[in-house]
């Protein structure tokens, strides 16, 4: 991938409704669930162009790691915290090093996701926290997943099962992006049905949801407003039984 791609993605992460509101939701959840943490040491795995790392700076020092070497080099040019290239399957850090370890929409990109969460657990301090977000429900699989090289989508029980071997406990979990769940599900299922009805064997060109829905204008504002309902719902202490995405917070045993 060239620098032009990462420049586009830089703006996408800072302007698109999904990235903007997700970041706001995550900051609020971290602040609430970790009891207004300050001066903690966080590791952000899969930092991309750094917006989640910027968000984590609110809570203390941040180390970032990104698998894509070119993306890492691009982000190093402006990120205010350290970022290095590396893999979630072999994190280049000592055991028990970080108060908070985050993997926001990362483990779905990894074939050996069990090894991935074990590495997150390994570098987390005893009594520290791991925060994970993933796309939800395999029946929502579509071109967005293919173009982003996902291996899977998750249910709540599947994510719990993945974390079960780790020593510690889940302190919080919920689906989110839920007010848009039914429209998005209907759209994806309709696209799949129409393709089947057409009788064509070849798949249409894969397009990301971010490309389909765009980042500018009234569509972005409307979808941002709807997604903000999730923010207020979760901030009020409520949870969702279904959604396009899923989040979980895990506390490592002391």
Model regions: which residues?
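Conserved N-terminal segment of class I S-adenosyl-L-methionine
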Residues: 1-96, 100-104, 117, 217, ...
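A short glycine-rich, Lys/Arg-flanked "PGG" loop and its adjoining helix->strand segment in the class I
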Residues: 114-129
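Conserved S-adenosyl-L-methionine
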Residues: 168-178
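A C-terminal cap/extension of S-adenosyl-L-methionine-dependent methyltransferases
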Residues: 180-254
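Feature marks short, surface-exposed loop/turn motifs that line or immediately flank catalytic pockets
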Residues: 71, 138-140, 179
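Short conserved AdoMet
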Residues: 57, 76, 111, 125, ...
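Short, glycine-/aromatic-enriched active-site segment of Class I SAM-dependent methyltransferases
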Residues: 7-13, 131-152, 156-164
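Residues lining the SAM
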Residues: 104-107, 133
């Amino acid at each position: 991938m060239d620098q032009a791609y990462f420049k586009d993605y830089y703006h996408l992460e800072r302007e698109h409704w999904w990235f903007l509101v997700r970041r706001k939701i995550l900051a609020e959840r971290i602040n609430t669930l970790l009891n207004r943490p300050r001066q903690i040491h966080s590791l952000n795995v899969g930092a991309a162009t750094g917006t989640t790392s910027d968000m984590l700076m609110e809570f203390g020092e941040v180390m970032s790691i990104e698998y894509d070497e070119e993306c890492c080099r691009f982000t190093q040019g402006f990120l205010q915290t350290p970022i290095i290239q590396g893999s979630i399957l072999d994190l280049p850090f000592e055991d028990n090093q970080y108060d908070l370890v985050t993997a926001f929409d990362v483990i779905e990109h990894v074939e050996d996701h069990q090894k991935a969460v074990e590495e997150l657990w390994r570098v987390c301090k005893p009594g520290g926290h791991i925060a994970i977000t993933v796309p939800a429900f395999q029946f929502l699989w579509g071109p967005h997943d293919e173009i982003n090289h996902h291996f899977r989508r998750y249910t709540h029980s599947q994510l719990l099962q993945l974390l079960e071997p780790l020593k510690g406990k889940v302190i919080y979990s919920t689906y989110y992006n839920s007010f848009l769940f039914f429209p998005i599900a209907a759209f994806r299922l309709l696209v799949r049905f129409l393709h089947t009805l057409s009788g064509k064997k070849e798949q249409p060109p894969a397009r990301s949801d971010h490309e389909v829905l765009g980042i500018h204008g009234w569509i972005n504002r409307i979808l941002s407003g709807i997604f903000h309902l999730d923010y207020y719902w979760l901030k009020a202490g409520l949870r969702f039984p279904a959604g396009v995405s899923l989040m979980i917070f895990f506390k490592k045993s002391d």
